[in-house]
Amino acid sequence: MSKVYDWFEERLEIQAIADDITSKYVPPHVNIFYCLGGITLTCFLVQVATGFAMTFYYRPTVTEAFASVQYIMTEANFGWLIRSVHRWSASMMVLMMILHVFRVYLTGGFKKPRELTWVTGVVLAVLTASFGVTGYSLPRDQIGYWAVKIVTGVPEAIPVIGSPLVELLRGSASVGQSTLTRFYSLHTFVLPLLTAVFMLMHFPMIRKQGISGPL
């Protein structure tokens, strides 16, 4: 086993990377509230794992979506547990994200030189909210249907471009198969990809600049 480790160590300098990670200075004022971002990340990883598991059974069509969710909850092995964990971690992710944003704002973590860290964090917060909106529609139940109908109907109040925006969001004049397809694609591919990209921008900046000082 040591020979395998030595082979990788010679080429990748694994020990140096590990030392850099474990020896990072943590300011004495840091408390549990500074862990909210990490908890949000953990919830996101749980979401990815459980969401991926459900894609094996979920069918994104208006005629089969609700039945496929019922199948996950009643027939698929541990489906009820996977979907429940997905829902619970989704709620936890939103809550932790909100608390994290408030903590950063109240402790002045958005100030120079961390402006870009703040901007990427705000984008991640918007993406988190978008996960909630798109995911809510996927079971194709009454609550999800009317929630999506109301949310996608909000831009209609905008003069001139309101109606085209609504049709762009829904895929048609009304909430239907095109809407479900759009939201499923956003929820399972576009939003996770964008979230991963902005996380890869967000975390290195935190690593480089360190944790902000106390007020």
Curated annotation (Swiss-Prot):
It is found in: Plastid, Chloroplast thylakoid membrane. The chain crosses the membrane at residues 32-52, 90-110, 116-136, 186-206. GO terms for cellular component: chloroplast thylakoid membrane. Binds 2 heme b groups non-covalently with two histidine residues as axial ligands. Binds one heme group covalently by a single cysteine link with no axial amino acid ligand. This heme was named heme ci. One of its GO terms (biological process) is respiratory electron transport chain. GO terms for molecular function: electron transporter, transferring electrons within cytochrome b6/f complex of photosystem II activity; metal ion binding; oxidoreductase activity. Heme b 2 binds at H86, H187. Heme c binds at C35. Pfam families: Cytochrome_B. InterPro entries: Cyt_b/b6_N (IPR005797), Cyt_B6_PetB (IPR023530), Cytb/b6-like_sf (IPR027387), Cytochrome_b_N_euk/bac (IPR048259), Di-haem_cyt_TM (IPR016174). Heme b 1 binds at H100, H202. Keywords: Chloroplast, Electron transport, Heme, Iron, Membrane, Metal-binding, Photosynthesis, Plastid, Thylakoid, Transmembrane, Transmembrane helix, Transport. Its cofactor is heme b; heme c. It is a multi-pass membrane protein. It comes from the Eukaryota. Component of the cytochrome b6-f complex, which mediates electron transfer between photosystem II (PSII) and photosystem I (PSI), cyclic electron flow around PSI, and state transitions. The 4 large subunits of the cytochrome b6-f complex are cytochrome b6, subunit IV (17 kDa polypeptide, PetD), cytochrome f and the Rieske protein, while the 4 small subunits are PetG, PetL, PetM and PetN. The complex functions as a dimer. Heme 1 (or BH or b566) is high-potential and absorbs at about 566 nm, and heme 2 (or BL or b562) is low-potential and absorbs at about 562 nm. Belongs to the cytochrome b family. PetB subfamily. This is Cytochrome b6.
